[in-house]
Amino acid sequence: MSSPVSKPPPELLEPNPGKSYGIMEIAIIAAVITAVALVLVCLLFLMLRYLYRHKGTYHTNEAKGTEFAESADAALQSDPALQDAGDTSKKEYFI
């Protein structure tokens, strides 16, 4: 009896089913994740810089020279922006 001649198995043209991503896809995913992380770090830096620079900033629109007045009424009566030619007894002050 003769022994049958064995043929090598045919080569598969399909990619390995265990390999889900190629090197190019991994590089693209890594670049996107790095870009998102960089943007988040930059936004965090800008927010902290803004908060640090504007810490405790409080602007008022009070009249000049009113800090030396004895009371709020005296300061408002001496304020030139509130002065008019009318009678001072009928003025109303909104504080």
Curated annotation (Swiss-Prot):
Keywords: Cell membrane, Membrane, Phosphoprotein, Transmembrane, Transmembrane helix
Modified residues (Phosphoserine): 71, 78, 89
Membrane-side (Cytoplasmic) residue stretches: 47-95
Record membrane topology: Single-pass type III membrane protein
InterPro entries per record: Glycophorin-C (IPR042192), Neurexin-like (IPR003585)
Record GO cellular component, one term: plasma membrane
Cell location: Cell membrane
Extracellular side: 1-25
The keyword Signal is assigned to this record: no
Listed transmembrane segments: 26-46
Main location: membrane
SMART domains, per database record: 4.1m
The family this protein is said to belong to: Belongs to the glycophorin-C family.
Name under which the protein is recorded: Glycophorin-C
UniProt organism field: Mus musculus (Mouse)
